[in-house]
């Protein structure tokens, strides 16, 4: 917005003083009462009394008023005073130009809305982490579900880590280790994006009146974020599991059509209950431990990528060890023809069939997968958050420089 001015002239007002006027808002030309506040802004004021003639040239600032007083002797020994107050430009007029953005590349990130940047950061972090650890995930799924897939007649109730690796390589080749990864990536992009974005959102909601986030608040934010992302992407998780462990399927569309034809829409939500029960504490513990451990480090270490990686490994190890049995239960309930009707039914059934160790089938490959997976995801997201914060500071610095250059000279006194 450009500068707007109006001119008011007062004639034949003897001993014109500021006390002669009562306005609804503080006038920019007021003298005695404004001296201290304007000096703090670096402005200078002339005397407090006008005689004979006074003219007022006024333009109002939205955020602050800067005035220029010029006192000159008029005819008959009278004094003439002029007040000029300049309207500032709108904030967007101080925004960096294209040339300034090119000179400061970090500021380019601020072009993307912060919420959108966080959302896409979560998506990228999840996809990268999942693709790297896909072979370990496939091995874990085979170990977790072998007992149910083999059936009651099979004498071999479980397979080991090395046996699962050998079986995949022998029957399916190298590509077999990434079987089911495409639907997993398709799922993990919205899943990770929603999860990490939701966590940041829930943390804001769960802050106390003092603005601080308690341990319970962090746990609650993590649990809600985990359940939110699971609810949104759950059908894709079921498709990924079926494609990874059931023979005969080659594409995700084949699995989906067969499930609709033979089992109905409800089959896409098999095991949703235990999934929510397992993911809520897992994400709550994982994210909470990551935040708290990172926060407890000396400030100089908090900014280092290595610290984020190690912290994420510790958080993932604690969360995995605590919540893994629930993950095994939900996987077995997702399978076609599962004999289990509830979480308690699955819990007792697995123990009766395989013993307590059955609840931890696939724990080793899962730990090997989840630790780098979580490290890559949380570290990538942490780095992007730092970049976003840095870009905001850079944009503000450039805008402040532009504002200073555009600001008019403040009060100059001439006699």
UniProtKB/Swiss-Prot annotation:
Primary subcellular site in the record, as a coarse category: plastid
The keyword Heme appears for this protein: no
Annotated Gene Ontology cellular component terms: chloroplast; chloroplast envelope; chloroplast thylakoid membrane; plasma membrane; plastid; plastid envelope; thylakoid membrane
Membrane topology (UniProt): Multi-pass membrane protein
Traits of the deletion mutant: Plants show a 30-40% reduction in the thylakoid ATP transport and metabolism.
Transit peptide: 1-61
Residue positions binding ADP: 187, 330
Residue windows of the Solcar repeats: 113-205, 213-296, 307-387
Keyword Membrane: yes
Record's subcellular location: Plastid, Chloroplast thylakoid membrane; Plastid, Chloroplast envelope
Matching InterPro entries: Mit_carrier (IPR002067), Mitochondrial_sb/sol_carrier (IPR018108), Mt_carrier_dom_sf (IPR023395)
Description of activity control: KM and Vmax values toward ATP only are increased by m-chlorocarbonyl cyanide phenylhydrazone (CCCP). The corresponding values for ADP are not affected.
Annotated tissue distribution: Highly expressed in developing photosynthetic organs such as leaves, flower buds and green siliques. Also detected in roots, flowers, mature leaves and stems.
GO molecular function annotation: ATP transmembrane transporter activity
A GO biological process held by the record: photosystem II repair
Similarity-based family: Belongs to the mitochondrial carrier (TC 2.A.29) family.
Biological function: Specifically transports adenine nucleotides. Involved in the uptake of ATP into thylakoids in exchange for lumenal ADP.
Entry protein name: Thylakoid ADP,ATP carrier protein, chloroplastic
């Amino acid at each position: 917005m450009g500068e707007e001015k109006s001119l008011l002239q007062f004639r034949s007002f003897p001993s014109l003083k500021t006390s002669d006027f009562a306005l609804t808002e503080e006038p920019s030309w007021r003298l005695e009462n404004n001296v201290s506040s304007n000096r703090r802004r670096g402005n200078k004021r002339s005397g407090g009394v006008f005689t004979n003639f006074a003219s007022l040239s006024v333009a109002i600032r939205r955020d602050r008023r800067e005035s220029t007083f010029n006192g000159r002797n008029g005819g008959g020994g009278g004094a003439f005073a002029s007040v000029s107050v300049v309207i500032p430009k709108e904030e967007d007029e101080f925004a960096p130009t294209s040339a300034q953005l090119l000179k400061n590349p970090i500021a380019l990130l601020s072009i993307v809305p912060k919420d959108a940047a966080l959302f896409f950061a979560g998506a990228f972090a999840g996809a990268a982490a999942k693709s790297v650890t896909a072979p370990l995930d496939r091995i874990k799924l085979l170990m977790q579900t072998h007992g149910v897939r083999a059936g009651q007649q099979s004498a071999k109730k479980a397979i080991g880590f090395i046996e699962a690796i050998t079986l995949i390589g022998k029957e399916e080749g190298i590509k077999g280790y990434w079987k089911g990864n495409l639907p997993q990536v398709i799922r993990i992009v919205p899943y990770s994006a929603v999860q990490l974005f939701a966590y940041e959102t829930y943390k804001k909601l769960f802050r106390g009146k003092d603005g601080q986030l308690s341990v319970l608040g962090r746990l609650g934010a993590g649990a809600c974020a985990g359940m939110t992302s699971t609810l949104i992407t759950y059908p894709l998780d079921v498709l990924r599991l079926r494609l990874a462990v059931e023979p005969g399927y080659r594409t995700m569309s084949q699995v989906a059509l067969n499930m609709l034809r033979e089992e109905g829409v409800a089959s896409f939500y098999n095991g949703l209950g235990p999934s929510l029960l397992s993911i809520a504490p897992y994400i709550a513990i994982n994210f909470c431990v990551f935040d708290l451990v990172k926060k407890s480090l000396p400030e100089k270490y908090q900014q280092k990528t290595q610290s984020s990686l190690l912290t994420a490994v510790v958080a993932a190890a604690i969360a995995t060890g605590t919540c893994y049995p629930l993950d095994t239960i939900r996987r077995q309930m997702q399978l076609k023809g599962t004999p289990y009707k509830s979480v308690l039914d699955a819990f007792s059934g697995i123990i009766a069939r395989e013993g307590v160790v059955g609840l931890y089938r696939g724990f080793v490959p899962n730990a090997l997968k989840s630790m780098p997976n979580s490290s890559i995801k949380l570290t990538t997201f942490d780095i992007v958050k730092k970049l976003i914060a840095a870009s905001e500071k850079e944009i503000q610095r450039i805008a402040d420089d532009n504002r200073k250059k555009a600001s008019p000279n403040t009060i100059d006194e001439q006699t």
